[in-house]
Amino acid sequence: MSLTIAVVGRPNVGKSTLFNRLVGQKLALVCDKPGVTRDRRIHAAELQDLCFDVIDTAGLEEAGDHTLEGRMCSHTKAAINEADLILFMFDAKSGITPSDLNFASLVRKSGKPIVLVANKSESKAAVGVEYEAWSLGLGEPCPISAEHGLGLSDLRDAIMDAIGKERVFESKNAEKCVSVQSASVGDYVDDLEEKGSVCDESKQPLRIAVAGRPNTGKSTLINRMLGQDRLLTGPEAGLTRDSISVDWEWRGRHIKLFDTAGLRRKSKIQEKLEKLSVADTLRAIRFAEVVVIVFDATAPFEKQDLQIADLVIREGRVPIIAFNKWDLIENNSQVTLANLHEKCAHLLPQVPGLRAVPLSGQYGQGIDNLMENVMMMHRMWNRRISTAKLNRWLETIVAHHPPPAIFGRRLKVKYITQVKTRPPGFVISCSRPKTMPQSYLRYLSNGLRNTFDMPGVPIRISLRASDNPFAARSKKK
């Protein structure tokens, strides 16, 4: 059983900065503005020879249960219940506040081992605050600077003293420590793509990002999938800020779900924090294999919906549209759905055969249908076609509709091979590739989809000039 440590405290004391320091990556958004973190995030961490799971939490604030701050506080309390040890953090530069005193009492009632952490202790204003910190009743404070990485050795010793050496090293093993030192998101994706078919896909978690405009029900959908209120939800638009990953299992398949911040139009994004959230969402989309684009069924196909779908297609991820809030459609007949499918084909012609499913995240209707489509599309996205089959297909399709003549000379399409999967990528050898019309490339791309049963999958085709066997002879002359 792994050791779990929760980092808690009032807003803007540096919890997310310490979280990033412990996991060795900038996973959590960090900003001077208080209340940046809203959902709890868990990740494998390492502190010298200690391996554990660390939970970043929202700042504790005094508020009613039904307010946004109150709901955030309830998620932090859930993290306290999940943890084996609590790091209670306060701002040494600001000193002890009445809020610190109130929340210290809350943490003490949990009965969990607690380490009092005095962050920002590098500041001159922090001198003497350790005496004041005794008023919290949590023992001697451990001074650190999460931003500069100071005092982490003392923090490691404090954790050991609080929970005991036997408990700390109970679950330590080589595999976990190696996993903490894993590559960044981008390196991991590149590594998987280089391995291609050598990597056993069934043993890797399927990465699914849930994206869309603000307030389309992304977090509600994921909560329904998990069967618990894991993510913060509410009527307010733009609740999610960080891209939160959660583990899930569907019919025996391990899945990693990514909840993302809603993407607004670029012209409306002014604040630094929202820009950071958007960048985090874009990273999650690039890291994912399948992206479920959540449309509000009561107001589908807004301009921003189409731009998000186009972004996913350009990134080469598997796009699947989910018409959420289907329970609010009065006439949810097959005719309505057929009309929406027709609009999909008309407004998103980049990928013919795009999958679109109706569902209700609030009531759980249509989730199995969504996941069946996800699994099917993921298999297509990973498909590899033999060169012999491809060239037989190419010969047939070119004979049926030859390339056009450019400046009186007909283009010659000679050879095709698949060079990658995820998404499927093909190289075609032809004469004068720079003059190949885009319309003929679309013809070849759609032909590939139809013949090899890959509807709704982004396909990339590159053209390469064929070798001229007489080029060397002409140079000799």
UniProtKB/Swiss-Prot annotation:
Pfam families the UniProt entry points to: KH_dom-like (PF14714), MMR_HSR1 (PF01926)
Secreted among keywords: no
Ligand binding (GTP 1): 9-16, 56-60, 119-122
CDD domains with a match to the protein in the record: EngA1, EngA2
Keyword field contains Repeat: yes
Keywords noted in UniProt: GTP-binding, Nucleotide-binding, Repeat, Ribosome biogenesis
Residue intervals of the EngA-type G domain: 3-167, 206-382
GO biological process, one term: ribosome biogenesis
InterPro entries: G_ENGA, GTP-bd, GTPase_Der, KH_dom-like, KH_dom-like_a/b, P-loop_NTPase, Small_GTP-bd
SUPFAM superfamilies per the UniProt record, alphabetical: P-loop containing nucleoside triphosphate hydrolases (SSF52540)
Binding site for GTP 2: 212-219, 259-263, 324-327
Molecular function terms from GO: GTP binding
Domain KH-like residues, every copy: 383-467
Superkingdom of the organism of origin: Bacteria
Physiological role: GTPase that plays an essential role in the late steps of ribosome biogenesis.
Family of the protein in this entry: Belongs to the TRAFAC class TrmE-Era-EngA-EngB-Septin-like GTPase superfamily. EngA (Der) GTPase family.
Subunit annotation: Associates with the 50S ribosomal subunit.
Protein's UniProt name: GTPase Der
Organism classification: Bacteria, Pseudomonadati, Pseudomonadota, Alphaproteobacteria, Hyphomicrobiales
